[in-house]
Amino acid sequence: MAIGEADPWRLQYFEGIPCPDGIDIPTEDADAWIWFPQHRWIYDKLAIAQSQGIAAAPHGVVPPRFPVFSKPMMNLRGMGIGSRVIASPQEYAAALTPGHFWMELLEGEHISTDVAVENGRAVWWRHATGIPRPGGTFDRWVIYAEPRPQLEAACGTWIASHLAGYTGMMNLETIGGRIIEAHLRFADQWPDLYGDGWVEAVIGLYANGVWSYADTARSTGFSMVLFAPSGPRYRHPEAGILAALRERSGISSIQITFHEDWDPSRHAMPPGGFRLAIVNCHDLGAGRAVRAELREALAEAMQPEILYLKGAA
């Protein structure tokens, strides 16, 4: 298997699919940074902003106006670590951090887009938006069947201008049609929701340099996220319970997204909670029901003093 996947709960999407020797397909930014040195500059978020004429500069350069958005120039762990809005010069002076930068505070829809790229030309798109909750957490992601022609045109032009010669998958995060982050990989949280044969098409893109995927049966999907309070050491639910839930109509897959033998602090998590599970589905009602049952199962696996998980939203 040449698909580099660090999270064991996501290997289910790639196991058993043949992949030629010598082909490296990243799902982790650290791998992509190593494997694609010519294009690794895109992990510099300050460079991404400047490539589009977005007002931005390293900490130490005072913004001409507030509020601004501040974050690390480079963060390969994700989860929005170190990101925040800075509202005033006084707050900015107190928040100065080496390796961070500020950028103008963008407005508009926040979209995550997976793109297949052939030699610097975007040839396939799929878009998703998150339903946020406090503290950088999410209730769910909606993976849309519909295209976004205006966004695709703008991002396609940027890709052609800045990634000549690149062949592979990309993930772009945009706000109001402007790119805030770019990744040399796809979103490995929901590849099953893209349809049968999609992973094989990705392998073909890296192996042969050609994207070949009919994509004739698109349907909107949902990636339901289960968060709980940070701090406790959670345990996995029983395998039999998981197997039964995976068989429910409308459910595509279930991920238990933590290592129960790790100290909780080793996991990269947003400030608002600890992510326990993800339910991918095409039926929103079924996904909500299975997520609720997962919450109960995870609570039953815990010690009595933290059974409050049963009441978590």
Feature roles, as predicted:
Residues 107-110, 115-164, 176-225:
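ATP-dependent carboxylate/phosphate-activation module, predominantly the ATP-grasp catalytic core
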Residues 52, 204-313:
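Peripheral (often C-terminal) accessory segments that flank ATP-dependent C-N-forming ligase machineries
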Residues 77-82, 192-194, 233-237:
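Short, flexible/disordered intra-domain loops and linkers
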Residues 1-39:
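N-terminal pre-catalytic "stem/leader" segment of glycosyltransferase-like enzymes
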Residues 27-158, 292:
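Active-site nucleotide/adenylate-binding loops and adjacent lid/helix of ATP-dependent enzymes
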Residues 164-177, 257-258:
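A short glycine-rich, hydrophobically flanked beta-strand micro-motif that places a catalytic Asp/Glu
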Residues 66, 109-111, 168-170, 220, ...:
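Residues at beta-strand starts and edge strands
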Residues 55-56, 97, 163-166, 246-254:
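Short secondary-structure junctions
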